[in-house]
């Protein structure tokens, strides 16, 4: 789960990471009031879960409350890489002497934690990583030992911080590790971490990604979810405990097991090239069970997607046999009734496949086509979607 900047800022502050005062606002009038409260120069910052805000006009400096009001009017409602700005943060201004970069992330390739830090970093860290990769220190972090005071100083030296700054930045590095460790994060990034003209180290902008699988250990994490920004179909699927991700295609996908579903996406994409470029509309893994209730919930979500013009149900019977899956499909269609309006292509294989196919063929639902192989089923689903 990605956090908004203001949520990351509040999290940093709770762990003692130095941040600037900031106030969240939803309207231009609220921005004016926030600017008056903070006083002096403020920065009005769009709250969206994507990068490139500054270049898109989503970050503006204001010297007065009236200027902040005008800035907010230009930012609220702005589209930034497909994200509409509904909220801004009004942050106190700071005189910056130098920008740095610091992050901790989960290195999936090495199966460990990785710290990235740069004395020469900051907002242009991506360019620096390409043109001068030696300026970006990469330090593996032992998950058990973590980042203590000594390790924080080691990181600062590896990132070429001068000795006079190490005593200032090392405690910040250590506290950012606490955020990462104690909140079960997969990313904690500060870009930029700055040195102000008055000699303070400030986390000026932060990104935090929390591991949703660890949500049961953190009562406060549920409150950080942005229900308003969630895709309504994904929110609906989550209510039924379905593993669903909306895509931009026309063929709805239901399968059991993430690997099978991903393979199904591939074969549908390939088949779609022969039928006008149709593509998968979603990822939906119903897991090991395929009861009528689970299948109905999955179909209800997929059929609610206006882009979907056909559905491909691809199930390999293992612990759950194919006859149970077939009964689940029949029960789901009966349960949905008139809400089921789009053709279904069903491919079953594995445990008790003959009985599963017999159940579907005897039911002879007008929307259901039973196909023998995955390639044939993908081609049929793509053909129906393109019709």
Curated annotation (Swiss-Prot):
GO terms for cellular component: cytosol; succinate-CoA ligase complex. It comes from the Bacteria. Mg(2+) binds at residues 191, 205. Pfam families: ATP-grasp_2 (PF08442), Ligase_CoA (PF00549). GO terms for biological process: succinyl-CoA metabolic process; tricarboxylic acid cycle. Its EC number is 6.2.1.5. Keywords: ATP-binding, Ligase, Magnesium, Metal-binding, Nucleotide-binding, Tricarboxylic acid cycle. SUPFAM superfamilies: Glutathione synthetase ATP-binding domain-like, Succinyl-CoA synthetase domains. Coiled coil: none annotated. The keyword Magnesium applies. Its cofactor is Mg(2+). Substrate binds at residues 256, 318-320. ATP binds at residues 45, 52-54, 94, 99. GO terms for molecular function: ATP binding; magnesium ion binding; succinate-CoA ligase (ADP-forming) activity; succinate-CoA ligase (GDP-forming) activity. Binds 1 Mg(2+) ion per subunit. Pathway: Carbohydrate metabolism; tricarboxylic acid cycle; succinate from succinyl-CoA (ligase route): step 1/1. Residues 9-236 form the ATP-grasp domain. It catalyses: succinate + ATP + CoA = succinyl-CoA + ADP + phosphate; GTP + succinate + CoA = succinyl-CoA + GDP + phosphate. Belongs to the succinate/malate CoA ligase beta subunit family. PANTHER family: SUCCINATE--COA LIGASE [GDP-FORMING] SUBUNIT BETA, MITOCHONDRIAL, SUCCINYL-COA SYNTHETASE BETA CHAIN. Succinyl-CoA synthetase functions in the citric acid cycle (TCA), coupling the hydrolysis of succinyl-CoA to the synthesis of either ATP or GTP and thus represents the only step of substrate-level phosphorylation in the TCA. The beta subunit provides nucleotide specificity of the enzyme and binds the substrate succinate, while the binding sites for coenzyme A and phosphate are found in the alpha subunit. Heterotetramer of two alpha and two beta subunits. This is Succinate--CoA ligase [ADP-forming] subunit beta.
